[in-house]
């Protein structure tokens, strides 16, 4: 379903938080939404892989990578795993790699920057905890909406039929 974050902000101005405009789109889907699942890690993606193995239908993975852009937390293999398991999208407060492959996958991916260096594969980090970046706090079970214009967050699902 097509979403327009600008229109959603107009309709739900008092209900949504707007993430600072620091992200670029790298996936093959330009707009996506779903229930938030969080991971907090630093330059390692083992825990990300574990979470992406879960059923992702109706879910968006929000990764707090500390804003580090020295290693790509999401690569083509992890993005394909997300597609295979039905994830709607991935937001990375950090870097991604293999962007030529990412843009051909049927998933939304927003991140700070691309870099060719891979993350280590340790499972260090935490999941399903509140994470804070971009001027907002993301809680597991919040709802996130993203398009090429921006990313917004709501505690309740928004009516997309308006």
From Swiss-Prot:
By sequence similarity, the record places it as follows: Belongs to the RraA family.
Q: What does this protein do?
A: Globally modulates RNA abundance by binding to RNase E (Rne) and regulating its endonucleolytic activity. Can modulate Rne action in a substrate-dependent manner by altering the composition of the degradosome. Modulates RNA-binding and helicase activities of the degradosome.
Q: Where located?
A: Cytoplasm
Instruction: Cite the record's note on assembly.
Output: Homotrimer. Binds to both RNA-binding sites in the C-terminal region of Rne and to RhlB.
Q: Which GO terms describe its cellular component?
A: cytoplasm
User: Where does the UniProt entry say this protein principally localizes?
Assistant: cytoplasm
A GO MF annotation of the entry reads: endoribonuclease inhibitor activity
SUPFAM superfamilies per the UniProt record, alphabetical:
RraA-like (SSF89562)
Instruction: Report the Pfam families cross-referenced here.
Output: RraA-like
Query: What keywords does the record list, in alphabetical order?
Result: Cytoplasm
State the name under which the record lists this protein.
Regulator of ribonuclease activity A
Could you provide one GO biological process annotation from this protein's UniProt record?
regulation of RNA metabolic process
List, alphabetically, the NCBIfam families matched.
NOT-MenG, PRK09372.1, RraA_entero
């Amino acid at each position: 379903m097509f979403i327009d974050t600008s229109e959603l902000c107009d309709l739900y101005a008092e209900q949504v938080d707007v993430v600072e405009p620091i992200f670029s789109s790298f996936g093959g889907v330009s707009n996506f939404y779903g229930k938030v699942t969080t991971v907090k890690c630093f330059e390692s993606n083992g825990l990300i892989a574990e979470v992406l193995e879960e059923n992702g239908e109706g879910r968006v993975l929000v990764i707090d990578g500390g804003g580090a852009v020295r290693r790509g937390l999401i690569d083509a293999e992890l993005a394909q795993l997300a597609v295979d398991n039905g994830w709607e999208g991935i937001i990375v407060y950090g870097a991604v790699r293999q962007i030529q492959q990412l843009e051909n996958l049927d998933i939304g991916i927003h991140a700070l920057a691309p870099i060719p260096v891979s993350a280590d594969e340790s499972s260090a980090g935490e999941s399903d905890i509140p994470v804070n970046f971009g001027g907002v706090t993301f809680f597991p079970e919040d709802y996130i909406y993203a398009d090429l214009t921006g990313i917004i967050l709501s505690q309740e699902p928004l009516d997309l039929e308006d």
